């Protein structure tokens, strides 16, 4: 059936989306055995731009979900970074249980780091839970899912996956994607350069075609697809301009959303979500400079930060970390800067027995954390204090997987971006502003199971996994820290909750992989290949690096 005129396609060609009336007959729906859940991720989307576009009528498919369903502001992890946020979202627990905090994890008994992978997640994601229970599931483009793991359907890894192959299972499906010209990651983690608009559009078309084919099959009950290109473009050109490149890409994603809803069919609950938002920051705070100026970190005499060298970030960032550690006197550095994103930063004490060159006695940790927290709270720029919150990571991110986690996480005033820079300049101004992550993402949902609600709720990103399982009437784990949000249902029902250890179907990652070393070997081969291409240089300008942004701090959008 044709849609109302507001649903006609932009840019000169028309399309008819058989968008189901997602709320129709929902009151009578009581059988959950055949309902499906489609989760679409728009990486980096925030209501600051979504709401004006909805009001302008340029996102008709998303507007239908809003009018028939409900919305929630989705608070990201602290810090708001895609690796931690998406992993926590689909595992239902925070970084203290997943072990994923940033894009790198420390090597034991070393000051070096390595790029994370899907095996860095110590918590079972929903696709493993569902597959272990025999539920069909497709996963397409979710960050930090490489190496791909076998699921009861198709798994196509997203951000951090290599372009050459080894990113999808079954292998026959990967060959089909390669023949179509598909690339799993458009950012600069595995590539020398960012994609232009033409390249983005080409990949969107390929991804849309592949997803429409998958969703048109009847062998799945849950499908998750993330569109990372929005984050990649936002790191370059984010603005609130409704005619800007990010807004135009959102319009394209809305059209694709209509195609995917049509392919999924009428008995499908649809969730459109993001891992964080975006904004422009007119000022920066160099965390390394703060630590040096307050005598928490000491430099080796005569050393200077090395400048950035071109190459994939998967290698450039670890090289930069090694160069940075070489430039520090670790025997005298009591605290070290860790991940920074948006107006959030993190720090870690250099503890003996935990850090390879630690200088802080474990007995000193409580006292020094208190002093470091006070120094952060006392930090002033232009006569005004700029740190608004400081958290102990053990309280903010409880859990046993703490190898990659900091000791303190802090938040600054909204216009001050925290960076891990050269350590020379504490504070810099960027009149045009620099694009980076914001804390709050989006959740927009509608479907036959979901009751409409006009008031916007507040959720945590960890709520997504439990809520998806509850929509499918699947048992939840007692260990989940996220909420299942049963209040969104037309007919609320109590959740089925079991301890993880009492789920006889659940398999570990090694059991899922079947003991195969294929993916481990692929990772080793990939890193050797990149090194042989000369991408082993260092990167000194980490203060300007977002998750896919190679610009230097002084550059402005053209």
What are these regions (language model features)?
Residues 21-24:
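C-terminal motif of bacterial Sec signal peptides marking the signal peptidase cleavage site
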Residues 30-33, 48-51, 197-223, 230-272, ...:
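A long, amphipathic alpha-helix that forms part
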Residues 33, 399, 469, 474, ...:
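Long, internal low-complexity/basic segments
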Residues 34-51, 64-65, 89, 130, ...:
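Beta-strand elements within well-structured catalytic alpha/beta cores of enzymes
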Residues 42, 57, 81, 103-133, ...:
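Secreted, luminal/periplasmic, and some membrane-associated catalytic domains
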Residues 49-218, 231-232, 483-488:
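Active-site-proximal alpha/beta segments of enzymes that process anionic O-linked groups
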Residues 415-465, 472:
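Low-complexity, glycine/alanine/valine/leucine- and proline-rich hydrophobic stretches
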């Amino acid at each position: 059936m044709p849609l109302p005129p507001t649903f006609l396609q932009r840019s000169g060609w028309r399309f008819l989306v058989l968008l189901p009336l997602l709320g129709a007959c929902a009151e009578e729906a009581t059988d959950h055995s055949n309902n499906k859940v489609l989760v679409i991720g728009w990486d980096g989307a925030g209501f600051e731009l979504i709401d004006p576009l909805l009001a302008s009528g340029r996102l008709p498919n998303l507007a239908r979900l809003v009018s028939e369903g409900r919305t929630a502001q989705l608070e990201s992890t602290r810090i708001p970074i895609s690796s931690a946020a998406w992993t926590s979202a689909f595992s239902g627990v925070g970084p203290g249980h997943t072990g994923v905090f940033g894009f790198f994890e420390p090597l034991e008994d070393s000051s070096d780091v390595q790029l994370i992978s899907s095996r860095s997640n110590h918590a079972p994601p929903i696709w493993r839970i569902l597959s272990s229970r025999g539920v069909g599931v497709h996963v397409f483009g979710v960050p930090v899912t490489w190496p791909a793991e076998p699921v009861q359907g198709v798994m196509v890894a997203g951000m951090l996956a290599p372009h050459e192959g080894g990113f999808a299972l079954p292998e026959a499906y990967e060959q089909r994607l390669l023949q179509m010209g598909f690339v799993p990651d458009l950012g600069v983690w595995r590539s020398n350069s960012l994609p232009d608009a033409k390249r983005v559009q080409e990949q969107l078309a390929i991804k849309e075609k592949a997803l429409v084919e998958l969703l048109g099959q009847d062998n799945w009950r849950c499908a998750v697809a993330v569109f990372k290109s929005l984050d990649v473009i936002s790191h370059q050109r984010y603005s609130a301009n409704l005619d800007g490149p990010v807004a135009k890409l959102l319009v394209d994603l809305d059209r694709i959303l209509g195609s995917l809803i049509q392919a999924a069919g009428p008995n499908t609950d649809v969730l459109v979500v993001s891992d964080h938002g975006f904004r422009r920051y007119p000022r920066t705070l160099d965390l390394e400079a703060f630590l040096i100026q307050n005598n928490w970190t000491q430099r080796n005499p005569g050393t200077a930060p090395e400048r950035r060298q071109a190459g994939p970030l998967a290698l450039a960032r670890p090289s930069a970390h090694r160069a940075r550690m070489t430039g520090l006197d670790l025997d005298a550095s009591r605290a070290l800067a860790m991940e920074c994103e948006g107006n959030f930063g993190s720090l870690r004490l250099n503890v003996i027995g935990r850090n390879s060159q630690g200088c802080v006695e474990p007995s000193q940790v409580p006292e020094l954390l208190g002093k470091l927290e006070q120094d952060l709270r006392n930090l002033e720029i232009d006569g005004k204090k700029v740190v608004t919150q400081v958290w102990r990571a053990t309280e903010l991110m409880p859990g046993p997987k703490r190898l990659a986690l900091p000791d303190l996480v802090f938040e600054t005033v909204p216009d001050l971006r925290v960076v891990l820079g050269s350590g020379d300049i504490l504070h810099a101004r960027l009149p045009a502003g620099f694009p980076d992550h914001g804390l709050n993402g989006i959740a927009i949902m509608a479907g036959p199971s979901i009751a409409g609600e006009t008031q916007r709720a507040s959720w945590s990103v960890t709520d997504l996994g439990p809520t998806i399982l509850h929509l499918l009437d699947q048992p939840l784990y007692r260990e989940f820290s996220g909420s299942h949000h049963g209040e969104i249902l037309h007919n609320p029902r109590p959740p089925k909750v079991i301890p993880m250890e009492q789920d006889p179907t659940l398999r570990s990652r090694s059991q899922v992989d079947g003991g195969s070393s294929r993916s481990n070997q692929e990772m080793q081969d990939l890193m050797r290949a990149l090194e042989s291409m000369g991408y082993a240089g260092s990167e000194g300008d980490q203060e300007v690096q977002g998750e896919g942004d190679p610009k230097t701090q002084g550059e402005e959008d053209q």
